Swiss-Prot record:
It holds the Pfam family UPF0149. Belongs to the UPF0149 family. GO terms for cellular component: cytosol. HAMAP family: UPF0149. This is UPF0149 protein PM1723. Coiled coil: none annotated.
Length: 182
């Protein structure tokens, strides 16, 4: 997989007005919502590129990213799914903006995969509400960067946990196989 900045540049070069964080959030939302077949591609084109296909090389890269996300989310025991945010940890404001964008596009993807998302109750409903709040994350540039950085890392970890929770919740349930009696 490309680096965050290289991939963001690939998107920009292709005329796609998304950051790597936004695209990663969108794909993660679709996957967490239960879309595992190729139906993610038309949704990607429709909602990120005015219904136009991506250039072949870029689509191959996006497909690898989609497969990587699926693999990481499916490995619940490993719990090593990560949000794809800018690597530059010195610029906490850029990372905070990217988290907000990731979360916003995650909810878009999740909502497309689960159209009745607003009807969810209990823990899942609370998780959705929390994600909506995180989309509107605000800060003041005069805030203490160290405190903001620590808070941001906690929020990133919380969003990561919620993504895994939602992935588990919305996965199609396979019918329980009963043992065959002879």
């Amino acid at each position: 997989m490309s680096s965050y900045s290289d991939f963001s540049q690939q998107l920009k070069t292709a005329g796609i007005a998304l950051s790597a964080a936004e695209l990663h959030g969108f794909l993660t939302g679709l996957i967490c919502g239960g879309i595992h077949d190729q139906s993610w591609q038309p949704l990607l084109f429709q909602f990120t590129n005015e219904n136009h296909a991506y250039p072949t090389a870029l689509l191959q890269e996006v497909t690898q990213i989609q497969q990587h996300i699926s693999k990481k989310l499916a490995d619940i025991d490993g719990f090593d799914f990560e949000l794809w945010l800018p690597e530059n940890e010195d610029d906490v404001f850029t990372r905070a903006d990217a988290l907000s964008e990731w979360t916003n596009h995650f909810l878009l993807g999740l909502g497309l995969a689960q159209p009745k998302l607003d009807k969810e109750k209990g823990d899942i409903g609370e998780a959705i509400d929390d994600l909506h709040d995180i989309c509107q994350l605000g800060y003041d540039e005069s805030d203490d960067k160290e405190e903001l950085s620590e808070a941001l890392e906690e929020i990133i970890e919380y969003v990561r946990t919620l993504a895994c929770l939602l992935f588990t919740h919305f996965q199609p349930q396979l019918p329980e196989q009963k043992p065959v009696l002879h």
